[in-house]
A protein has these predicted regions:
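Generic detector of contiguous secondary-structure segments
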Residues: 3-13, 93, 110-119
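C-terminal "cap" of GNAT-fold acetyltransferases
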Residues: 42, 46, 111-125, 129-131, ...
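Acetyl-CoA-dependent GNAT
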Residues: 4-81, 85-87, 98-100, 104, ...
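Generic structural motif
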Residues: 1-3, 135
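Conserved glycine-rich acetyl-CoA-binding loop
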Residues: 62, 85-99, 106-108, 119-126, ...
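Short, contiguous hydrophobic alpha-helices characteristic of membrane insertion segments
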Residues: 66-69, 128-132
Length: 156
């Protein structure tokens, strides 16, 4: 399996939206504020794909995962909506998608990946650390006084 670009030729927008919502569903009772994934609609998702670079993991015609990324000057590629269908998690699909983002960053002359993950999702912190990311900052969403997310970076 190799990541495929999510571009104008991509045609399975309903499945992509379902994938993201299913992948992010487990965190809803655990995080506050709610994930921005819940605000996605088909038009918003299509616009996000046009404005950013995105990849899909597809096997035997089934959409298994996705990743979105966009340059953040001066040197980072910001990673968002890394999602893998629940029954395929832990099988290397997320890592494969991150490798596509790493290749895109390198080809774009960017030297690091940056992401944000919720403070409560410590299992995600561990996975990203295993993949070479280090915590570089903490922050809070607008309207919150407590920490709600951590920033992690990976130098390429």
């Amino acid at each position: 399996m190799r990541p495929l670009p999510i571009d104008d030729a991509f045609g399975d927008w309903d499945a992509l939206l379902e994938l993201i919502l299913a992948s992010f569903a487990y965190m809803q009772p655990r995080i506050d504020p709610p994930s921005s994934a819940l605000l996605l609609t088909l038009p918003l998702l299509m616009e996000k794909a046009r404005a950013e670079t995105a990849y899909a993991a597809v096997e035997n015609g089934k959409l298994l995962g996705c990743i979105f990324c966009k340059p953040e000057p001066p040197d980072c590629l910001y990673i968002s909506k890394l999602a893998v269908v629940p029954d395929a998690q832990g099988k290397g699909i997320g890592r494969l998608l991150l490798q596509a983002a790493e290749a895109h960053a390198a080809a774009s002359g960017l030297s690091c990946l940056r992401l944000e993950t919720r403070i409560e999702l410590t299992e995600n912190h561990r996975i990203f650390a295993k993949w070479g990311f280090v915590q570089t900052a903490q922050g809070c969403h607008p309207g919150f006084t407590r920490l709600t997310f951590i920033e992690m970076r990976k130098t390429l």
